[in-house]
């Protein structure tokens, strides 16, 4: 583990504190295609922050496009804007902005189409522009040209988590610890069994999952163990990163460029899959102003770096952070010899 935190930018959002009277407490982050950060402030709701102009705007006066607090914000791949899910109610909304004002483009109320859909657990968009909506009751797909949702069949495996690979293919981990490739073609949601996860114990579940650019599947279990598969997703190895999590709670797992990011409430681990170097960024570091990382306040920067937010704003870990550690070479030094 190397410690070199020179490439950290801090965004304490003083405009937000001045407007509300208390520190920023960010629960969600999402950087859109226009370099505008979508921010969900705890107990307040959706805001916008233009990084290039240091310009902040809230959405409190916009009754038509104000979802209140949200639980999910993900960038739209095919269309402009972001997909969001409000904290209360089973709705999915696509939103854009014009002159730092939020605009509602699409609004899908799941309760009008599905009986007892339950809360929305995740949103993932595939390479065809299909939005996969993972709820407590099942799996649904919103096609890019149709607001009528498609529902997975009753014999569809029960999923515990979804992710997408670099090509935009959708993968699902089932509650019985199997790996599936999912697809939606011609109004049909299908699944293909690709492997099993035998390394998990009986009561151990998959909490977080991602796929790196090599095609290897990474997962964090409910016991805090970290596993990585081979490219065929058939065999798994326990990564020696578990002890770096310590007593932290894992918030997310992301793959981007050469890195896999493991985000916890107290630290961020950046693992370079080619150099096999791991960087550690902790809230206790002097150049990180955020006290604690929160919920889903995680967003890629499209250049191999990461934005992570929480109490007192958010930080930007720039893409060159691991490269500086690459120059450090270590060789063993004998300190003791014991003869028996």
Per-range role (PLM):
Residues 1, 42-46, 88-92, 136-140, ...:
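Loop/turn residues immediately N-terminal
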Residues 3-7, 50-54, 96-100, 143-147, ...:
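Short loop/turn segments that connect beta-strands within beta-propeller blades
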Residues 4-16, 23-27, 34-44, 50-54, ...:
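Acidic, proline/glycine-rich low-complexity intrinsically disordered segments
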Residues 9-27, 42-44, 57, 62-69, ...:
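Residue-level "micro-hotspots" composed of small/polar
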Residues 31-34, 74-79, 125-128, 164-167, ...:
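Residue-level detector of Asp-centered blade-edge/turn motifs that repeat once per structural unit
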Residues 36-38, 81-84, 130-132, 169-172, ...:
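Conserved beta-propeller blade signature
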Residues 167, 173, 177, 207, ...:
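Beta-propeller domains
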